[in-house]
Amino acid sequence: SFVMGFMRSGTTLTQEVLDAHPDVFVADEVELVPALKRELHGIEKRGTSTAEKLALLDQSGVEHLRDFYWQKVYDRFGETIGDGLFVDKLTMNTIDVGLINCVFPDSKVIFVMRDPRDVCVSCFMQLMVPTPTTVQMLTWAGTSRFYALVMAWWSHVSKQLTLPFLELRYENVVANFEASYRNVFDFLGLPWDASVVDFHKRAAEKFVATPSRTQVTKPLYASSVGRWRSYESDMATISVSLDPFIDEFKYRQ
């Protein structure tokens, strides 16, 4: 299964809750799917874009990519993954969800959502290591434009996915943690385990590879919901980018 979304949307929280379940192993921000995409571009010489190459790929090519992915998993984690559910959490796998749909058509995707305004405030104010992704968010306008590009892609591609996916709202998690994650575990075909309620205690004992590491080692709190209201005047300057998604995702109040 896969956990994805947009940065600062709550993917790390979901990762830690899932990882607290005894029958789940979560790979935290490990570039397994990006490696898979590079392998696709290496074995399929026809076409130029990832989509074109996937369309030209035969079944043996799909099976090769599937084997390649799992070899990467075992090279990295070995037998520590156990025999439970393996979850690949890389937030920006959103961009490559079409590749996932092709290679792993029986997998499940949890797509974590949050109010676009809170996402952009949090991304812009968070100190992040420079990467090809994070450099898109060095300015207020750049942050909103990048968010709009990624979420427009999700809005488009999610209608074409054949694999099952669940959209999980951060605000619902904060308002009703247990009901939200009971729904998640039911979607994944796993029984509820009360130990996940104390996810923050487990997270405090290990390394978390994202800027959210300080938040997920504490009990859940609601202060980050509606944080954008403190910057309401600044929101007007990026409304052209965010308004379509505020409406589409029903965050208009």
Locate each region found by the language model:
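PAPS-dependent sulfotransferases, especially Golgi type II membrane carbohydrate sulfotransferases
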Residues: 1, 46-85, 123-167, 175-253
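Phosphate-binding active sites in nucleotide-utilizing proteins
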Residues: 1-104, 112
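Conserved beta-strand scaffold positions in the cores of enzyme catalytic domains, especially
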Residues: 26, 109, 165-167
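A secondary-structure boundary/capping signal
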Residues: 29, 169-170
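Conserved nucleotide-binding/hydrolysis micro-motifs of P-loop NTPases
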Residues: 31-33, 116-119, 173-174
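Acidic, metal-coordinating catalytic cores used for nucleic-acid/nucleotide bond scission
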Residues: 91, 172-176
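Conserved coil-to-alpha-helix start sites within the AMP-binding
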Residues: 94-97, 118-119, 151-152
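Conserved phosphate-donor/acceptor-positioning beta-strand/loop module used by diverse small-molecule
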Residues: 100-124
